[in-house]
Amino acid sequence: MNTFFQKAVPIWAKGRADEMNCELAFRAIIAGQDASLHLAASSIYRVWVNGKFVCAGPARAAHGFYRVDEIDLTPQLCAGQNTVVIEVTAFNVNSYDTLDQPGFLTAEILQNHAVTAATGDGSFGVYDLHQRIQRVQRYSFQRAFAEAYRLRACKQAFYLGSDGGAERLESETQAEKRYLRRETPMPQFEPLQVQRIVQTGSVSFDVPCDALRKDRAYTQIGPMLKGYPADTLEEHLSDEAQTFAWKPSCHAAEDTAQITLENSYATCRFPYNATGFLCMTVECAQACTVYLLFDEILTDGDVDFLRLTNCNCFKYDLDAGTHRIMTFAPYTMMYLKIAAKGACRVSEVRMLQYQHPAPEFQIRLPEQKQLREIADAAVRTYRQNALDLFMDCPSRERAGWLCDSFFTARTEHALTGQCTVEKAFLENFLLAERFAHLPDGMLPMCYPADHYDGNFIPNWAMWFVLELEEYIKRSGDCAFAERAKSRVYGLIQYFAPFENEYGLLEKLEKWVFVEWSRANDPDVVQDVNFPTNMLYARMLQIAGRLYGDSALLEKSQKLQETIRQRSFNGLFFTDNERRTAHGLENPGNITEVCQYYAFFMGTADKRIYPELWQTLVQKFGPHRAADCCPDVAPANAFIGDYLRLELLYLDGQTEKLLQDLKEYFTPMAERTGTLWEHDQPSASCCHGFASHVLYWLAKIYGTEKTQYAGA
């Protein structure tokens, strides 16, 4: 039953609800009295009042559900008539960020408890400004489309109530929607100014390139990865930008108020790696084209806009006049290269940050510069990745990954004392009636997301159960365990056919993921992977505790003993066994992370394996010598380094924990002001799980309820 809207119904332009990358504007004129806007939309929206940006959204939900935002418009209103514009882009492609669902907007404005404008009654006009270029490449494999626009200065009048050259369209009512309340807080959209210009120079266009880099999101468009095929694109953004030749002339400038460009570029630096909507004002006496290229770091002193396999290059064709540019979706960057073909003046370069509000608690840190820098970086990392659910990264994917969420959830409780985002995140897994393209019982590795290729990570589904137990302990929400019971037992039922004669999971399907290291290599994760089975035993134990199931508890205990007997070689736990004609044989693969799994999952403890424990504590970690245990492959940040630090914390080795923490994270905090996916800047440089650093610091030093000054 719809309890969120009194009159509004979902609408879209007639015949266009399934159109890919379709941007429309919905406009209403209201009086200047207190007003509240309620809306839900697919895929993403932004709201303007009298030409000024108000907010963007929505919060994401499971397939077939849509969360409703309630926005107070009163502060933006003036006396007399006011123009409210809601822009919505419907992507209609599968991704890990937004769902492949038809475009719609349901919106109504309440004033004095009465509806003064509502979609479906004619008070919201539907328009196409014909500025967004639809046929562009995907932004990444995990996200929908990159951005390219043909902006006309006259159309800015549309946001103030004039015609502006927009085409009014006939609307039609869409299928009825199921609505949910937005439980997570609205972002605050704090502006972040460019700090300085790090390089300027000239640029030549259309310079032949020997070998163009082309990502799968560009070349593999089809039923499994929806988008516009390369031969149908209006703009080939990544190809075009690879034909630019840069000639640096100046390497630094402090004045960023106005940047004059003519067939030239300027590379700007933000104070830290940030996520949000990139904004600027561009004035040009004649038509010109502006390109925005960006990344989280500089690679060999320059912006590599394809480093993360994203298309971090957007294009704006501008006519003569003044243009206010704002990206429609949020992006992540520390470095922005602005290039102009033709002449223009660029000013007011800034980002409207799209992140969780400032946390309620801060950590009572000692006066240590390194710890403060790490904590500040961790807070930024958390805020950028905990908006409406727990994301892996705010850049390439913006996806709600399991396992990552186990760690980020601890940070939320440390910083806010609540589990609001975690509940919304976990609830999405329960709301879905089924997970299309996945086998019965299996949970998606990230959600809400579309997995048309049928891929999943069996390990990550197990982490759902581990997080479920911690969520219930943190929140006291025991009813949630009952809501999740069918999911948990469905998962256990899924794994049952993979148990071999020893009770070990063997030859699991799809992406068996241990961590980003040698432990993930194909010859290590199959056929019987011991870290995976350690996790399985822990999952069974937790399910047994949650639901009072003694059979699961007994099964877990037996499995742990089997792993100890078959994996441990007298010095280390080995990673796997392979099935041969003679049965299971151990090839002797050993990884550092396997040892951490053993201790974290309860397979091992320091009482039974004291020598191994001392080796891990004293010889491994960030200070590990190059010639130390050469047969043991090193761990990476995700998740080995974090399991190591957690084990040190649980063992009460605070001094050692802080020492390792500084060695791991100081280089990250100093370089980007955020914490990374890997121990090197080879992937995402703002990864949500990395904020778990704050959990340990909060446990060690305590927290106090105050505005966090370092974010």
Residue ranges and their predicted role:
Residues 400-711:
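Active-site core of glycosidic bond-cleaving carbohydrate-active enzymes
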